[in-house]
Amino acid sequence: MTDSTYDVTRVRTYLQGLQTRIADALGALDGTPLATDTWQRGPAERLRGGGCTRILEGGRVFERAGIGFSDVAGDALPPSASAARPQLAGRGFEALGVSLVLHPRNPYCPTVHMNVRMLIATKPGEAPVFWFGGGMDLTPVYGFEDDARHFHQTCKDALDPFGAELYPRFKQWCDEYFFLKHRNETRGIGGIFFDDFSEPGFERSFDLMQSVGDAFLHAYLPIVERRAELPYGERERDFQAYRRGRYVEFNLVFDRGTLFGLQSGGRTESILMSMPPVANWRYNWQPEPDSPEARLYSDFLVPRDWV
């Protein structure tokens, strides 16, 4: 967080363009265009503003793909946003960002999440305070080391122009953030995560956010192209549904974006579009020793240096 010099219009224009570019690329890959759901909140509602949700369900490649843009404002930062910044509690805010979660149909094709956002906290008589956040992370059902290395290398390449120290810092942040404490396991193989970022000022921070957003298709599409047509059976789909249960647990219990949206009176359909279309839970299930399912736990659901 830093001084009050910023340009929301440029950020908004970039984010709307990013959503369109990603939606067009995913629609072309799947063969099904993503539907558009534009929404607006009235000036008297708890949360003002609006957004656009691009959504695909039941596609050839993607069982569910959701990309949301929102630009909303409220009278008081919700607890999930001000807990680490008590000096900002009670301030008004504007939050704008793009968030996506893609759940492929093929169990060999990993789920992915990406988010880039800007928040501005305001208080009459005081300078506004802004910061950026975002990142991307990969959640495989069946792990492939080539995919993990490619994803992390692309993340590193996006950050390196802004300082060689940022990738290891944001990678560790991601490993620690996307962790299910009650399961004692990571959600996936991580990636990068950052929040409260404005150290270099608006221009450089905005450039970094754009670099992360622009890297997403390069990080993920080659993996989809390698894995989406691999043959699979009922066993793999069953394990996929089981692992998706972990995704649900994290998003509803720990995810700050989900909590921010629900606590601030956000649009529930857009907030919960990250949920997988099918998930299941089993009592005390364990994978067979030395199986591909066991390898996910031993080789991938532990923090590793992938690059």
Swiss-Prot record:
Binding positions for a divalent metal cation per the UniProt entry: H103, H113, H152, H182
Location of region: Important for dimerization: 247-282
Origin: domain of life: Bacteria
GO CC annotation terms, alphabetical: cytoplasm
Biological or metabolic pathway of the protein: Porphyrin-containing compound metabolism; protoporphyrin-IX biosynthesis; protoporphyrinogen-IX from coproporphyrinogen-III (O2 route): step 1/1
Active site: H113
UniProt keyword list: Cytoplasm, Heme biosynthesis, Metal-binding, Oxidoreductase, Porphyrin biosynthesis
Role, per record: Involved in the heme biosynthesis. Catalyzes the aerobic oxidative decarboxylation of propionate groups of rings A and B of coproporphyrinogen-III to yield the vinyl groups in protoporphyrinogen-IX.
Cited NCBIfam families: PRK05330.1
Subunit structure: Homodimer.
Name of the protein in question: Oxygen-dependent coproporphyrinogen-III oxidase
